From Swiss-Prot:
Gene (name only): bioB
SMART domains reported for this sequence: BATS, Elp3
Protein name: Biotin synthase
Organism: Mannheimia succiniciproducens (strain KCTC 0769BP / MBEL55E)
NCBIfam families xref list: bioB
Residue span(s) of domain Radical SAM core: 50-277
Family: Belongs to the radical SAM superfamily. Biotin synthase family.
Length: 336
């Protein structure tokens, strides 16, 4: 049955095409170089392929999460060495945001490890968002499941994007997470859209899912209506103490295929290389950029796991003739 997962929106953003799992799986089966080439053409039609959006991600409340996500070192259920830390104060967060901006970041993302915020937390978050927004940065928050009215409060404070990942396909989901359902995630995404916030929504590759399940994950994202403005693609970072610490290694070409398929199915979305980039070679990252990735997390840490060093990122971008995205270079001139 051809259905999209309708999310509320205050702006028209018609779904262009329905993507069945079989149709997405057929893309995965495309010969590797042909798939990358096709994705590169789609990318050029919608973005400047030499411009990379730089985002910084900061954990503003760390550890102690009651959820059982099998990949997450911040879960209180696993012995991973992550120490619980309460919500940071506004001044410390703003200082980090200033540093991020001085180093070229245009978006500042904030993550809090809890199932979802309480009303008192929202009051603190709105203060933080206003302070970061005043620096001239785009703001993004990943704060878990939202109750009614919370998304509107975040929007009013100046939040631009809300991140809430699907993580994986509906078929594979219960093998990874048991304390919140796939539909719970869709429900929060609906509240985010209804409030007029932009959506950042992606997932994690390499959690023992099959290629068909990867296709199901991409299909679920591509059939959100409207599609997410930002799609983070994470490669599993295996952390000792988590249930997925011994997950099977994923061949690098499969990750690049996933990036390419995301670009083809969601042509106007930012496709972000997120967690796991520290373990990627320069050559693999270059292939991801060729396949349509146009955003990275920039900084030496992603929440509680390592990230590629900034000096290495700057050098790689120089080698590939890439430049940080600005409002002036976001699109090729013929696409303006």
């Amino acid at each position: 049955m051809k259905t999209t997962l309708q999310l509320y929106s205050n702006t028209p953003h018609p779904q262009v095409e329905y993507w069945s799992v079989c149709k997405v799986e057929a893309l995965f089966e495309t010969p590797f170089l042909e798939l990358v080439h096709r994705a590169a053409l789609v990318h050029r039609e919608n973005f400047n392929p030499q411009a990379i959006q730089l985002s910084t991600l900061m954990s503003i409340k760390t550890g102690g999460c009651p959820e059982d996500c099998g990949y997450c070192p911040q879960s209180a259920r696993y012995q991973t060495g992550v120490q619980k830390q309460e919500l940071l104060n506004v001044e410390d967060i703003v200082e980090k945001a200033k540093i991020a901006k001085s180093r070229g970041a245009s978006r500042f993302c904030m993550g809090a490890a809890w199932r979802g915020p309480k009303p008192k937390d929202i009051a603190k978050m709105t203060e933080i968002i206003k302070a970061v927004k005043a620096l001239g940065l785009e703001t993004c928050g990943t704060f878990g499941l939202l109750d009614d009215g919370m998304a509107e409060d975040l929007k009013e404070a100046g939040l631009d994007y809300y991140n809430h990942n699907l993580d994986t396909s509906p078929e594979h989901y219960n093998k990874v997470i048991g304390t919140r359902g796939f539909d719970d995630r869709l429900n929060t995404l609906g509240k985010v859209r209804k409030a007029g916030l932009k959506v950042c929504c992606g997932g994690i590759i390499g959690m023992n899912e099959s290629r068909k399940e990867r296709a199901g994950f991409i299909a679920s994202l591509a059939n959100l209506d409207p599609q997410p403005e930002s799609v983070p693609i994470n490669q599993l970072v295996k952390v000792e103490g988590t249930p997925l610490s011994d997950a099977q290694e994923l061949d690098w070409t499969e990750f690049v295929r996933t990036v390419a398929v995301a670009r083809i199915t969601m042509p106007k979305s930012y496709v972000r290389l997120s967690a796991g980039r520290q373990g990627m070679s320069e050559e693999m990252q270059a292939m991801c950029f060729m396949a349509g990735a146009n955003s990275i997390f920039y900084g030496d840490k992603l929440l509680v796991t390592g990230n590629a060093e900034e000096d290495c990122d700057r050098l790689l971008m120089e080698k590939l003739d890439l430049e940080p995205e600005t409002t002036e270079n976001r699109y090729l001139s013929q696409n303006n």
